[in-house]
Design a protein with these regions (language model features):
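Pocket-lining segment of extracytoplasmic ligand-binding domains
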Residues: 85-86, 157-161, 165-256
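Sec/Tat-exported extracytoplasmic proteins
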Residues: 45-48, 53-54, 76, 81-84, ...
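Hinge/cleft segment of the Venus flytrap/periplasmic-binding protein
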Residues: 294-296, 300-316
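Bacterial N-terminal signal peptides
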Residues: 8-17
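Sec/Tat signal peptide C-region and signal peptidase I cleavage site
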Residues: 18-22
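Bacterial N-terminal signal peptides that target proteins for export
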Residues: 1-8
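Short, glycine-/small- and polar/acidic-enriched structural segments
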Residues: 23-155, 159-175, 194, 202
Length: 316
């Protein structure tokens, strides 16, 4: 009964949102199409946390031709989710960004290989699939830093390259491509998998970003948005079943095909990534040491041309 009441509330809020779109003040864009990876934002909207903060928010998902990074640069979106590695690449290219909320404290990135892996050195001489941008560039940087000869094969977001036999190994997210491989019948053994977080590279990933200019001119609204989002993730962590229902509702509304099993897996994995590996708590703060590790590896691996400091990315 409780879940039915919540779903009725969600539906009413959807109708309300559609009625106020023309008065939108803030546009937020996640990294990809609707899915459980962005559950905290959906909860913040559906539970009225944005509205309580006096904000009118539209969640606008990106497309292949108009990414969240492009939307932020053009001003079409005011706030976006970015993996830390992506944010640093953008800053290296000249964008001035501010991290206003670091919700994923851990890395969900992993390497999956056809042959047993003892370390990343075993990728030497192999063809390895990787995402075109984002956290996978961190692994590319590690490979370059230690002079591994890896044939990197880019993909957008799917496990088909690995399933087709076109590559020897692939980078994957624990909450997405790993499930795709399991669902496709791959019986992966522990020795075929390396989690980056288990080998000293547990760097934070998804965070909330704005441009420095927008932050200076709309500081109060941005901080209210960040706090409402934090509340959304907290509610999601405490109500995973209801949150899953909400995610499926958002996916249907955005015409994104999926199934409840994949999204349940994704939500469970993403909720794990919220916790600080040192304390087990959800801090929503970018850890300086984890940031420095990310920036240093990207620089030493020639992904970025100059080191970026913690002070450059935090609130002025």
């Amino acid at each position: 009964m409780r879940r039915l009441k919540l779903m009725a509330t969600f539906l009413m809020l959807f109708l309300f949102r559609m009625s106020v779109c023309a008065q939108t003040e803030l546009v937020y864009t996640p990294t990809w199409t609707a899915q459980a990876q962005f559950a905290g934002f959906y909860v913040a909207e559906a539970m009225g946390y944005f509205k309580e903060a006096g904000l009118k928010v539209v969640i606008k998902h990106p497309t292949a031709s108009n990414t969240n990074a492009n939307r932020l640069k053009s001003g079409e979106s005011h706030l976006v989710s970015l993996q830390l590695a992506s944010a640093l690449e953008m800053m290296d290219d000249g964008s001035q960004l501010v991290n206003v909320l670091q919700y994923f404290q851990q890395s969900g990135l992993m390497v999956i290989s056809r042959q047993p892996l003892k370390s990343l050195n075993d990728l030497n001489g192999k063809r390895v699939g990787h995402f075109r941008t984002g956290a996978s560039m961190f692994v590319v940087a590690i490979g370059r830093k230690v002079h591994l000869d890896i044939d990197w094969v880019p993909f957008i977001s799917h496990a088909n390259l690995y399933l087709s036999g076109a590559i020897d190994a692939t980078l994957a997210m624990s909450y997405n491509e790993y499930f795709q491989l399991k669902a496709a019948g791959q019986r992966l053994k522990k020795e075929q998998i390396i989690y980056l977080r288990d080998i000293g590279y547990n760097v934070p990933e998804d965070g909330l970003y704005v441009t420095k200019d927008f932050f200076k001119n709309h500081r109060e609204e941005v901080l209210k948005f960040a706090e409402a989002t934090r509340r959304g993730w907290e509610w999601a962590a405490q109500h995973p079943k209801e949150t899953l229902d909400l995610v499926m509702l958002y996916m249907r509304q955005n015409n994104v095909p999926s199934n409840v099993y994949a999204q349940r897996w994704m939500l469970e994995e993403c909720l794990k990534l919220l916790t600080d590996p040192k304390t087990g708590k959800r801090t929503y703060r970018l850890d300086p040491q984890a940031f420095d590790l990310t920036s240093r590896i990207l620089y030493e691996g020639s992904i970025i041309k100059k080191p970026i400091t913690y002070q450059q990315i935090m609130q002025p």
